[in-house]
Amino acid sequence: MWPQTSSHAEMMHWLATTDAALTIIGDPINPLAPRSAQNTMVTYCSSRTQNVCGGACTFYNGGATCLNAPNTNCLAATHNVGFCDRAGCGHSCNQLSTCGTRLDNGFCFTPGTRSIIVPPA
């Protein structure tokens, strides 16, 4: 069965090996911090080519928030998140756990995403 979320290790590996143009926001990544695994890590990107998510990507590490995510076409996260078709985390939203089109490396195809709900971990 396909896991709906990526593990911390899988997310770190993707970050270390991707050639995507990355913008990093939120808390600094500190693998030695005891609470670091409690943060939610979300990577959301502008492009999908076949089963690969990439292009311009943003990586978020932190707690509960609403992320402004215009032009998002795919995403991955270490906890279940919501993705919405309007800014401000409203209108029509879906959960990563119910991803309809899975992509490589734990990503989900999420065309039309404009914001992402990061719940408390």
PLM region descriptions:
Residues 1-41:
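N-terminal prepro-regions of secreted/extracellular proteins
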